[in-house]
Regions:
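A structural detector for beta-sheet-dominated domains
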Residues: 9, 20-22, 47
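A short, exposed loop/beta-hairpin motif centered on an aromatic-Gly-Thr core
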Residues: 13-25
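Short aromatic-glycine-(Arg/Gly/Cys) micro-motifs in beta-strand/loop hairpins
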Residues: 1-15
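A short, charged, amphipathic alpha-helix used as a generic interaction element across diverse proteins
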Residues: 22-43
Length: 58
């Protein structure tokens, strides 16, 4: 399992979470579900802490 950092942006407020997952796919799906559930979330940035690869979910 790899470690990922999620930055959840709600307007100007940014919440950071460290999560473990096998890859971006499961976290992207979770991020899309979070955005559809919470109208205040504007953007979620997922960063692989090992490789610094970044994906943005809007």
């Amino acid at each position: 399992m790899r470690r990922f950092e999620l930055k959840i942006q709600r307007g100007r407020e940014v919440e950071t979470r460290i999560m473990r997952a096998n890859g971006f796919g499961s976290l992207e799906g979770m991020a899309q579900d979070m955005i559809s559930d919470d109208y205040k979330i504007t953007k979620i940035t997922i960063t692989n802490l090992a490789t610094d690869e970044v994906k943005v979910v809007r």
